[in-house]
Amino acid sequence: MVKKHQNSKMGNTNHFGHLKSFVGGNVVALGAGTPYLFSFYAPQLLSKCHIPVSASSKLSFSLTIGSSLMGILAGIVVDRSPKLSCLIGSMCVFIAYLILNLCYKHEWSSTFLISLSLVLIGYGSVSGFYASVKCANTNFPQHRGTAGAFPVSLYGLSGMVFSYLCSKLFGENIEHVFIFLMVACGCMILVGYFSLDIFSNAEGDDASIKEWELQKSRETDDNIVPLYENSNDYIGSPVRSSSPATYETYALSDNFQETSEFFALEDRQLSNRPLLSPSSPHTKYDFEDENTSKNTVGENSAQKSMRLHVFQSLKSSTFIGYYIVLGILQGVGLMYIYSVGFMVQAQVSTPPLNQLPINAEKIQSLQVTLLSLLSFCGRLSSGPISDFLVKKFKAQRLWNIVIASLLVFLASNKISHDFSSIEDPSLRASKSFKNISVCSAIFGYSFGVLFGTFPSIVADRFGTNGYSTLWGVLTTGGVFSVSVFTDILGRDFKANTGDDDGNCKKGVLCYSYTFMVTKYCAAFNLLFVLGIIGYTYYRRRATANSL
């Protein structure tokens, strides 16, 4: 009776811990999404600090450096301790907005200080965001898609939430905006230091998987062949160690117990450790020293195992394939997010639309809202959809990436639609800006689906041990791709710009070539992902038939 009561008490405590970690992770994610707020305060900041607008592209690239390139460092810290990562992230964001506030208040014309602040904002934000996603994916292994969708979607929604609050509360007072962001975002990310936890039973689900994966990675480039898209469900041989005092373990989750029984892969543990001799003169201190030594060795072994697992994963063809897929779609999405304002301006400057009383700032603000809102919807809906695909149809989460690639293809084709044949300027303007708005919605939703699904794909494929490090490396692909796509767009605008006032006045011709390139890239991505799905399906069938 006492044991049953203790188990019940432990279960309630465990549920509370999961809930606290989940809620805290969502608060952290909401506070960490302010890199997308740059366009809200950038014009006033540059004007106040007497920095030319031409430097804005370099400043926005500083955000990308902090959130993507330095994301590798953030991932390593998260894998060590999500709490520590949130503490570091909170300090970085606090210091960054403090520096921006001082630059704005004292009119310091220092591109270096502002760039440094933006790097800190990018790094601090992903430090908190990666920690929240890691805890969601690890603590809820049977519902990774749904659990991970909440912090991912709130991160995408954060920009719209804070831009609305700042505009309502402070209006044009950017100095107060920086103070508000410094306190609010810093404190929200700091919540993770007190709430985020990785529960041992969830990590334990992946422990034997990691050992099997490391053993298998020496035999084949594909480290691991999952039975379904869930990192706890694997077909494989038990890990055999050269040490006589080790366990042989199979890792199969409860919800696929029937499958494990069908293949005669029942969970079991075998130990050949020698029994203590009755005459052995051991005291309780001997056992304590022995346990302490074993714990130390176990921790060192776990760290070494994680590093080896990450290294083997980085070399795998699957990881390289994921890097290409994510890099292309991430680059297209970020290019559109950073550049949609220029597309609106090109339409406004094109005759005869330049004769109409069009509020370009309002249309640009609408695009930001659509991108943020639809990105939130995509991130939130993609998780449950991918879970449904896995559990109901035993399909792969990569089908969501097929949908995202298809949406990017359609939006890239639609944005280049030319309405110059319409003679009525008002009708032409209405059609043109409606077309851009629809494309913003499509691009936003596809971007949300991409980042709402890919964290679960990575966790399913490579496990949660070393997950944040791998995710940090994966997101670096966007740094290079967005640089390429924005360079193509810049050349496209330059080729169609006259010498009079520096504005492109040729409508969709200002950017049509760029989106022809993105259309072909999306088509390649679509076929490439279908190839990965087909190859993975073939490997599973071959593995199942060989048992």
Swiss-Prot record:
What keywords appear on the UniProt entry? Answer: Membrane, Phosphoprotein, Transmembrane, Transmembrane helix
Question: What are its GO cellular component terms?
Answer: fungal-type vacuole; fungal-type vacuole membrane
Q: Locate the Phosphoserine modifications and list their residues.
A: S237
Q: Does the keyword RNA-binding apply?
A: no
Membrane association type? Multi-pass membrane protein
Cytoplasmic side stretches: 43-58, 105-110, 166-175, 345-398, 459-469, 536-547
User: Could you tell me where this protein is found in the cell?
Assistant: Membrane
**What PANTHER family does its record include?**
ADR278WP (PTHR21576:SF166), UNCHARACTERIZED NODULIN-LIKE PROTEIN (PTHR21576)
Q: What is this protein called?
A: Uncharacterized membrane protein YMR155W
Q: What is the lineage of its organism?
A: Eukaryota, Fungi, Dikarya, Ascomycota, Saccharomycotina
